[in-house]
Amino acid sequence: MGGTRKHGILSDTHLKTLIRDRAIDADPAVTDGQVQPASVDLRLGTKAYRLISSFLPERSEISERLNVLDLYQSELVMYEIDLTQGAILEKGHVYLVPLLERVTLPPDVRGKANPKSSTGRLDIFTRLITDLNAGFDEIPAGYQGPLYLEIVPRSFTIRVQTGLALNQLRLLTGRPAVSDSRLRVLHRSAKLLYHNDDDPADSRPLAAPDVRVDHGLFLRIDLRGSGTDREIVGYRAKKNSHVVDLSRTGHYSALDFWEPIYRQSNNTLLLEPEEFYILASHERIKVPAGYAAEMVAYEAAFGELRTHYAGFFDPGFGAGDGPRKGTQVVLEVRPHDVPFLIHDGQTFFKVVYEHMLDLPERLYGASIGSSYHQQGLTLSKHFKW
């Protein structure tokens, strides 16, 4: 893979070249609207399979596994669903959807996938699967073949249709991770983290000694907001049997589906097992043009507390044109096993920065249709107030 660097995330320029050369191919063809600054959206195909369980096809093609019988001679596939006119995927059930896109990757290019922001904020668990692969959300270098998406709606029953994009694919070559020493230099020169409690017309970056770096930037949780009484600092998903049609924007009343969480006097929050929460970061983050980033869970401290679904940040995230720099990170949180008490300012997750192979043609923001470019604590685009 040629370029100005030997290691990096492929930009929209490279992605369009791969699409033109049919290394990323689909029927109907991949559109320009699917191409983001550092990723490409992947679309649902024409049918879904309702499965009895999740699986990984480590030593076989996925199409072969769909005919395997379990201990009681039941097929992995319970039934098929036609998605061409839209269909319902029920919460708590496992589905597998062949995607419209397939890839023929160069030998030095591999891929990784993540849910789109709206997918994560709806508590829809998705994972990319490929043939002969022992891992989720990863495509090995040189892979040639179809792509499949495992879908498990957790909080809400959803309606989907052929052509809808629930996840995105990022392609990379070499070792693009930014070292800790480079991250510190980058924060001093480009300012990666900003305080969130300042004047909205101003931006104050974190002092260098306050930036915690260890294979990425550590960020904290915000349970205080501006400190006023009755301020909303999060949301918890309600038990709701209504169907959320993912093709509708600004359609559903937020209070029918979400319970606001108000700031407590001691700035803490008790997370209950198997409840789903939307929270926000204490800091505002920026991703400079020559970099991309990915949010990862702070696993060492939280174990089974899942702190995100959607994790990609495109070049230009949080940059903006106004005086207020940086953007809060919205977190999707689902505790497991036991109640978990968190407090304002607690270290909660980590963002890993990676080099771009070259600068993208376009940066993240409203000009490319980004729904959350000026987000604070924000629900998915399907809800209204």
Regions found by a protein language model. Give the residues of each.
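DUTPase catalytic domain/fold
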Residues: 1-385
